Amino acid sequence: MNLLMLTFIICGLLTQVTKGSFEPPKCWKNNIGHCRRRCLDTERYILVCRNKLSCCISIIISHEYTRRPAFPVIHPEDITFDYSDVDSFTGSPVSMLNDLITFDTTKFGETMTPETNTPETTMPPSKTTTSKTTMPPPSQTALTHN
């Protein structure tokens, strides 16, 4: 009986010590794949392991291996604003434009002045142009027109 107990202990220790044990060897990054002769339906072939085995990685997303990174914690005390470049910051969304003075354009070239409330007429630019149109030489016109 002592010999039988000794045999069971040795067999138990051998299964713990053996490298292959009873599961297929692991492969890929962080040992998430398994080396098999043929990948299962829920697995994808990635690369070749030793002894002509395929490294198979599961297609189904496992949150054990693919964890999302934690969101950075932002404390309101850490946020500072620098208003040194703004001269007069009022906190309102109004622009620095003054809406008290408006120019009413009634006709082309005629505007109302806000001080006297009289129309001023400005002459539009003259339409006479003194540009000469030159024709290219006949040799170049034959090249440009097909």
UniProtKB/Swiss-Prot annotation:
Region Disordered, annotated ranges: 109-146
InterPro entries hit by this protein: Beta-defensin, Beta_defensin_dom
Low complexity compositional bias, start-end: 110-134
Protein location: Secreted
UniProt cross-references to Pfam families, sorted A to Z: Defensin_beta_2
Biological processes annotated in GO: defense response to bacterium; innate immune response
Signal peptide start-end: 1-20
One CC-aspect GO term: extracellular region
Keyword Secreted applies: yes
Superkingdom as given in the UniProt entry: Eukaryota
Keywords: Antibiotic, Antimicrobial, Defensin, Disulfide bond, Secreted, Signal
This protein's record includes keyword Signal: yes
Predominant place of localization: secreted
Covalent S-S links between cysteines: 27-55, 35-49, 39-56
Function field: Has antibacterial activity.
Family of this protein: Belongs to the beta-defensin family.
Protein's UniProt name: Beta-defensin 125
Lineage: Eukaryota, Metazoa, Chordata, Craniata, Vertebrata
